C-alpha cells in the first residue's frame, strides 16, 4: 500500500497539504509518478528527482524538495513528502 503526505512549507508553516494513496505495493520505479500525482493535486510544479531524493526517502521515509530542485520558479521554501505507510 502507498500512502504519501505532501506538504508545501513556507516560513516553517504548512501552506498546502494533500495525501495520495494507492492499494498497490510501493515501488521506487513508480516514485516519480507518485510525486507528479501529489504535485498535481497541490497545483504545484513537479520537481526533478535525483538519486539523492530516492535514497533519502528510502532511508528516512521522507524527502525534502527545495526550490533549486524545480525547473520552474516556486513561491515556497520546500516541498516535503512523507511516507505514512511504514
Regions found by a protein language model. Give the residues of each.
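Short, extreme N-terminal segment that most often corresponds to the first beta-strand
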Residues: 1-21
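Generic structural motif
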Residues: 11, 23-25, 84-86
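Short, flexible N-terminal segments of the mature chain
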Residues: 14-42
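Acidic, low-complexity intrinsically disordered segments
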Residues: 34-86
